Amino acid sequence: LEALKTADLLVLFLRFQDFPDEEMQHIVDYLDRGGPVVGYRTSTHAFQIKRPDAKFLKYTWNNGAKNPAADFPGGFGRQILGETWVSHYGRNHTQSSRLLLQPDQMNHPILRGVKDVWAQSGGYTADPIAGSTVLALGQILDGMTADSPPAGDKKQVPVAWYRTYEQTPGKPGRVFTTTHGASEDLLNDGFRRMAVNAT
C-alpha cells in the first residue's frame, strides 16, 4: 500500500480486511490528501477491524452500530464511499439486476456511452449518504439473464453514485461507488464502459 504515496487513483475491490496499522496509515494518508476513490461492490464493507486497540478502528464497516453518536458512523463505507453494508437485496445467484440510468445524469462523464447495463451479481440495499448523486438505480430481475422480468416485489434502489468526501482534517476527494462490480458484471459492455469512465 506504500504505492498510495504517489498514486493518482485508489480502486477498491475489498471485503472485511483487517490491515495492520502501518498499512492502513497509507490509505488514511491518501484520503487525507483528497485522493480520488473508486469502490466496487463489497468495498462498502472493505474493513472489519477486530483489534480493539487498532489505530483506525473507526474505519470498520459497522462502526457505531451500537452507538449512533460514534465518530465516523458506518466506517469507511458510509463516510468515504457513501454507504456501508446493509444487506443483500434480492436473492443472490438467482436474481440479477438491470441498472436504470438516471435521465437527469445522462450528460455526466461517467455515463458517457453507457447503455443496456445489466449485472449478474445480486443487489445490495443502499441509501447513499447526503451529498451523493445517484447515477443508476437497480431493478431486481427474476432470473439470471438480461431479459428476465422485473421482480414485482422489489422497489428500485441506488446502485451507482458519485460524491465528494472530506477527511477531518483533510482535503476533499471525489468518489464513484457501485454496489455491483463482481467479475461477471464486467462482461457486460455497459457496465464495463461505466467502470472505464469512472476511472
Which residues make up each language-model segment?
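Aromatic-Pro/Gly-enriched surface loop or interdomain linker
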Residues: L1-D8, T199
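Catalytic beta-strand/loop cores that center a nucleophilic Ser/Cys/Thr
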Residues: T6, R78, G82-K171
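Structural motif
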Residues: L9-F13, T177
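A glycine-rich, often tryptophan-bearing local segment used as a flexible ligand/cofactor-contacting loop or short
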Residues: L12, F16-R112
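Glycine-rich phosphate/pyrophosphate-binding beta-alpha loops
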Residues: T179-D185
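Catalytic-core region of carbohydrate-active enzymes that cleave or remodel glycosidic bonds
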Residues: V196
